[in-house]
Amino acid sequence: MFDKRHRITLLFNANKAYDRQVVEGVGEYLQASQSEWDIFIEEDFRARIDNIKEWLGDGVIADYDDDDIAQLLADVDVPIVGVGGSYHLAENYPAVHYIATDNHALVESAFLHLKEKGVNRFAFYGLPDSSRKHWAAEREYAFRQLVAEEKYRGVVYQGLETAPENWQHAQNRLADWLQTLPPQTGIIAVTDARARHVLQACEHLHIPVPEKLCVIGIDNEELTRYLSRVALSSVAQGARQMGYQAAKLLHRLLAREEMPLQRILVPPVRVIARRSTDYRSLTDPAVIQAMHFIRNHACKGIKVEQVLDAVGISRSNLERRFKEEVGETIHALIHAEKLEKARSLLISTTLAINEISQMCGYPSLQYFYSVFKKEYVTTPKEYRDQHSEALL
């Protein structure tokens, strides 16, 4: 007995990374189940809702974080599975079957990551209430709950919505807030986009990240890997799994299976740790300044002498302070920084290995292979094949 062929509408703005991954998850279920579905989604991946009720087909999977979509589907008589953020109050969920990203778990993952790094001061950069982003309010609520439970003092700044006409003003206000935070504060941003705003403001203020402030975002948005000088740590949402679960649930509904209203929470995939939370508990201002200089210039072929010139103290003095604070020599830190930059580029980009070798200041590809294999007991190519973030 063959399943009836169904026409299914996907209502997502899949030009955004999160929505796109949800749609990919739907596709993965179709491939795995071999369901006979004809999928309708706008050609430019925008969720247009004009005359929506005339072309919904046999079932819908929709972005219920979008209030306009949720309202228009309120009295539609076809099976619907909503996808969106979780709520801490059960009564706030929409009255449809619902697959939710676990907002509390997302923030908790970021919080625990910072704690594991030795951070004990925390701040949250969210979105203003005027943005009408329920998931942002839920993440802020989760942050407040977590710091209260752990007896930490948490600072929250919602900031301003950003648009071209107010961008500089919003960044100036963000900079004002950042300057009120004590050193060694870990900032959890509500999204990677907001985290990138923090990194940009820190660069303009000459606040070293992660030496003085740590920053972690949520989404693991691929574009942010390239748009900020400091590589951003982030919590990867289970968006593909959400799409898969939504399609699986819709399949059951199309088969007229009787079931109570479903609420399925999908946890985050994992924390992707990058430079922005590579925190060491440093207290010596000269060492902090030197570490920041090394991180920004190691791949330009700097020697110990350039670090000394940047900090302005003698070699014996700085070497002694490095040994006390870091347990390494200045030269060893320059070497380690170059290698870490190369490792990061291997797993986060598709750049040719020879180009990475040149970018990181190695005199030849052969020498880079030798140094890399000595540290990681594998070749750069083998390491990329095993650890590439493109697999996420």
Task: Name each model-derived stretch.
Residues E305, H331, N354, S370, ...:
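Residues within the helices of the helix-turn-helix
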Residues F322-T329, V371-Y383:
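A secondary-structure capping/hinge motif
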